[in-house]
Amino acid sequence: MAIPHPSSLIPPGASRREDLRLVTGAGRYTSDWNLPGQLHAAFMRADRAHAEIVRIDASKALAHPGVKAVLTGDDARAAGFKSLPNAISSPGKNGQPMVKPHYPVLASGRVRFVGEPVAMVVADTAAAAEDARDLVEVEYRDLPAAASFDAAVAPGAAQLHAEVPGNLAFEYESGDAQAVAAAFARAKHTSKLTMDSQRLIGNMLEPRACLVAYEPSSGSYSFHVPLQGVGGMRGQLAAVSGLDKGKIVIATQDVGGSFGVRGPAYPEYFAAMLAAKQLGRPVKWVGTRGESFMSDFQGRALSLTGEIALDADGKFLAIRFDDRADLGAYGAAFGSFIATRNLTVTIGGVYRVPALYARTRLAYTNTAPVSAYRGAGRPDIAYAIERLVDYAAHEHGFDPIELRRKNFIPRDAMPYKTPNAGTYDSGDFEAVMDDALKRADWKGFPKRQAQAQRAGRLRGIGIATYLEAGGGGAAPKDEVAVTFEATGAMTLYAVTHSSGQGHETVFPQIVAAVLGIDAASIRFHPRPPAAELVGNGTGGSRGALGTGSAFHVLGNKLIELARPHAAAKLGVPESGLGYSKGKFHAGRRSIGFIELARALAGTRPHPLDTTAEGVYGTSYPNGCHIAEVEIDPETGAAAIARYTAVDDLGHVINPVLVEGQVHGGVVQGAGQVFGEQAVYDPDTGQLLTGSFMDYVMPRAGWLREIEVHDHPVPTPTNTLGAKGVGESGCSGSLPALVNATIDALRPLGITHLDMPYTPARVWAAIKSVNRDS
């Protein structure tokens, strides 16, 4: 029988079941957990960007009351820890591999960025550990710092790693350089623009922390740690420590924000493992906000120079990019992958472009390592493409809307194979744009602009027709499991972990919708009951299309698994048994699924306990975002006047969760456009934006008027037809808001500014053109 799609069965207003627990303070984050006899850790961190470690004197710290140990890089090296992981696997230019210098648990011989952990103090109390940390004395021999890509690759620059001459880690190519060059040679119009996607700091609500206990009889460790997925974190901890994954048990419950920053295993976690083993007691570390600013892996840090070639009618002939990526001091986790594969997978955007090419150079600098931040490269390339298209339209006299329309990949061309070997599964880009134009009242903008002008404000409108790649993951498949209780209630399991996405709500809803039962009888737990499940964590906009699709398969499997038991209970052959609305039925006789599960509970393991799996590839969420921005020319202050988002996310399972994800992504994009930037002193490498006094976060009042609408074109790549939503808001908002801001400034002669558009930067640009005129 046909099983109704879950999206047709979940009530439109279905709320998040975890919210009441979290907003009333009943959540349990890593810092809320304690173990008997636990010790507390504090880290002494580098106060300079680049220096040799001449000597570490921990004698005063060790003499401080309550201190149990002070560990340094020598101790970590003696313990045999391997380098922290780096995910890059793609070959570089001419097949050259990336140079990956050792990333130590604690600095050994040299410090390479402000905030790098140098020593760990372990004491009876957190206060004692923090006091003793300040007593650790380190003698340094200062070295010149290179705090940016340009400084790092300049002739004579200070070398961060002996094995990386010139600090250039890698050069990556994608596409056909010769075909692109030929297209540019015959083009009627060309445009070129350099766009910076500045370095950002994740600033999750919950700072990083860990609680580690060692069990000597089994040689195993138990962890409480903020993460994005049990499988990924366990794999990294095992790889660096040299342990079997079965020796690492993770018991995390709630996680307060992630944005990609939680995915990697950090040095502090391994140092805590070492201390817990050596001292025979659990070790707890809770980072401060200042430590997060300095030592959390950061995001973006890209500069993209884009060029586009057009014929006389405005048809795109080729696009090419020359990109520069700042990796920070080490190749951390996903940083190099983001700047290469992730940055180029959607290089053509939503457009039919015959020839594509990108070159990316990656350099080590004396700054915090760079890894994933919401979107992980895809918002950067979406911003660059949409900004470049808008720039070319105005430079060569094309209407920005019609130029896009002329070059869209049509719906009937799907699946569409791109010139750089990607395949877009589905989409209707023109229809999505037309939907957005109507909802945003694009034609009514001149009236609103005139009203703003009469009030002394500059008003602009910007559009972005973005494309995202959702569903990336390192695991070969997504496995899920279910167990049943005596009451017939069930618990779902997967290794993905929520940091605000609503897993406790949506995964039970999917299974309940397939079974036709109340979701209240189902709960979700992000850890398997016994055997390890294989699967991807929360990241890459994968939750619904990967884990969610596996739960959809599980729901259907449960019906078939229960069928012979239902037939036996009803005394009918399986062939005569139907299933609908949560019940098996044969004629007038029926038995409910929960009733059947309850009746089978006497057998252990429960006959319906089972697993399901699926292999789900990439899908391509897309959409059209339209923003209107007003600027006060006297102060340079910009305000978002209207915002309309129309997104093709495939089948929408829970509209409430989707709207929240889009809102959050748009606000994070607004943060990057109008305020956020991690700034390092170019001479010393000191972090100048190390607190909320200096680092501008988005404000609630920035986005008062936002409309979110769905325009679903289901994907065939997974059983739910879902495309993913977590990072789409960032990918759409960056170019839409930038294009709107530049549109407001264009009458003054300003055609481009780099982000962030702070009042000071916008005001300076306005004054500059006023002086020139």
Can you name each region flagged by the protein language model?
Residues 258-280, 284-286, 503-511:
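Thiamine diphosphate
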